[in-house]
């Protein structure tokens, strides 16, 4: 979910324009659903992302691929937006545009996206407990978790929001202990 800051800056006006359009045309729910599904689809098909991002491939070829793969799957206006991105050579920014658009939607709806890295997969009870606590801390109406499993953390979890990182991992505790021992003990 981490995206190049320059790409985010370039993507922001496109996301804002689509967000404003979706609000004006009362299409926010459809376009948001399309983008959420598209985000998952692109993560599962890195070859398509690579193909669309390749500057050596013509806009016409990219348009044909989008016609075959997505036209029947998404809203007409979402598809038109993708074609605009292809024609303006900005389809390579699709992932940051999706992220920026979804952030605009979530901010408007008081939904917070929070990244959680954990050593082991959470149970539903653990997810629900974490969501409840995060709602209290952030005053958000809704919390969306993006959970990644990273066995190098040994145990515990790491929470990342836009402005904060909360590290409750065993790996972090061991690193702190090692630093403390290094400063206290002279060998």
Curated annotation (Swiss-Prot):
<dbReference type="Pfam" id="PF00213">
    <property type="entry name" value="OSCP"/>
</dbReference>
<comment type="function">
    <text>F(1)F(0) ATP synthase produces ATP from ADP in the presence of a proton or sodium gradient. F-type ATPases consist of two structural domains, F(1) containing the extramembraneous catalytic core and F(0) containing the membrane proton channel, linked together by a central stalk and a peripheral stalk. During catalysis, ATP synthesis in the catalytic domain of F(1) is coupled via a rotary mechanism of the central stalk subunits to proton translocation.</text>
</comment>
<dbReference type="InterPro" id="IPR000711">
    <property type="entry name" value="ATPase_OSCP/dsu"/>
</dbReference>
<dbReference type="GO" id="GO:0046933">
    <property type="term" value="F:proton-transporting ATP synthase activity, rotational mechanism"/>
</dbReference>
<comment type="similarity">
    <text>Belongs to the ATPase delta chain family.</text>
</comment>
<dbReference type="InterPro" id="IPR026015">
    <property type="entry name" value="ATP_synth_OSCP/delta_N_sf"/>
</dbReference>
<keyword id="KW-0472">Membrane</keyword>
<keyword id="KW-0934">Plastid</keyword>
<keyword id="KW-0813">Transport</keyword>
<dbReference type="InterPro" id="IPR020781">
    <property type="entry name" value="ATPase_OSCP/d_CS"/>
</dbReference>
<dbReference type="GO" id="GO:0045259">
    <property type="term" value="C:proton-transporting ATP synthase complex"/>
</dbReference>
<keyword id="KW-0139">CF(1)</keyword>
<keyword id="KW-0793">Thylakoid</keyword>
<protein>
    <recommendedName>
        <fullName>ATP synthase subunit delta, chloroplastic</fullName>
    </recommendedName>
</protein>
<keyword id="KW-0150">Chloroplast</keyword>
<dbReference type="GO" id="GO:0009535">
    <property type="term" value="C:chloroplast thylakoid membrane"/>
</dbReference>
<keyword id="KW-0406">Ion transport</keyword>
<comment type="subunit">
    <text>F-type ATPases have 2 components, F(1) - the catalytic core - and F(0) - the membrane proton channel. F(1) has five subunits: alpha(3), beta(3), gamma(1), delta(1), epsilon(1). CF(0) has four main subunits: a(1), b(1), b'(1) and c(10-14). The alpha and beta chains form an alternating ring which encloses part of the gamma chain. F(1) is attached to F(0) by a central stalk formed by the gamma and epsilon chains, while a peripheral stalk is formed by the delta, b and b' chains.</text>
</comment>
<comment type="function">
    <text>This protein is part of the stalk that links CF(0) to CF(1). It either transmits conformational changes from CF(0) to CF(1) or is implicated in proton conduction.</text>
</comment>
<keyword id="KW-0066">ATP synthesis</keyword>
<keyword id="KW-0375">Hydrogen ion transport</keyword>
